Regions:
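Glycine-rich active-site loops that engage anionic ligands at enzyme catalytic sites
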Residues: 2-236
Length: 236
């Protein structure tokens, strides 16, 4: 795999592996290869792995490393990661899933759809077509539990955040900010351009796997009617 990365401290019990800092599916593929390979080793010293756009946070048991390996924890884990990733084969599976997420683009659920279409000089139908035409990658989860950062949208859809964020955005709202699209798993304040809403519950703390989306997932948005939306809607 691509060994052009750096490792920097992230507090007392973590380090950050960083690749070139930009939104790029090839770079994210390297992140996910590192994530899955380190995860497959099932080392007790590594307590968590958190992938993002172009980085991977590695949380580790510093006390356990010092006690059992008799070496400074950060130096040992950094050397271990460097050595391991340099030897990681390019054939490592990234175990991505394909998800079809229903979205209703009805005006009652899409407060920014009309204004955004006017700003872009296209019809609302064309905007919806552009948003649903491609398969996206979930690059990371963040901001809220289970909030998927998904990209990249068609250049015609790229839009800045709202100048005045809303104090409340409903759970399931689908938005666009910059080159990204995302889904609010919970009701919260937010400044993304809301163009629709999904009936799917994206975060369930009582579930075995609380987050509906995972980094590396391949996502396609499927338009549904308002009637279908309410038939499918799951309690949040």
């Amino acid at each position: 795999m691509n060994t052009t990365f750096s490792i920097t401290p992230l507090g007392d019990n973590a380090v950050m592996i960083e690749w070139e800092q930009r939104i790029d599916p090839n770079i994210h593929q390297q992140v996910m290869k590192a994530f899955h390979y380190l995860q497959s080793l099932k080392l007790s010293y590594i307590t968590d792995l958190i992938p993002a756009y172009a980085s991977l946070a590695v949380l580790y048991d510093a006390a356990g490393i010092r006690q059992k390996i008799k070496r400074p924890a950060r130096a040992w884990i950094s050397a271990f990661i460097t050595r391991t990733l340099q030897q990681t084969p390019d054939t490592v599976a990234t175990a991505s899933r394909s998800l079809q997420i229903p979205v209703c683009y009805h005006p009652s659920l899409a407060p920014d759809l009309s204004a955004m279409a006017q700003q872009k000089g296209i019809s609302e139908t064309d905007l919806i077509t552009l948003h649903t035409a491609q398969t996206y990658t979930v690059y990371m989860l963040g901001f809220l539990p289970g909030f998927p950062y998904i990209g990249k949208v068609d250049d015609q859809l790229a839009s800045p955040r709202l100048k005045q964020p809303r104090t409340q955005v409903p759970a399931g709202s689908v938005g666009i900010a910059g080159e990204q699209t995302g889904i609010y798993p919970l009701s919260s304040p937010g400044g993304w351009n809301i163009i629709g809403q999904t009936p799917i519950r994206l975060f369930d703390p009582a579930a075995k796997d609380p987050c509906y989306c995972r980094p590396g997932d391949q996502v396609q948005f499927v338009p549904v009617t308002l009637e279908t939306f309410y038939q499918m809607q799951q309690p949040s």
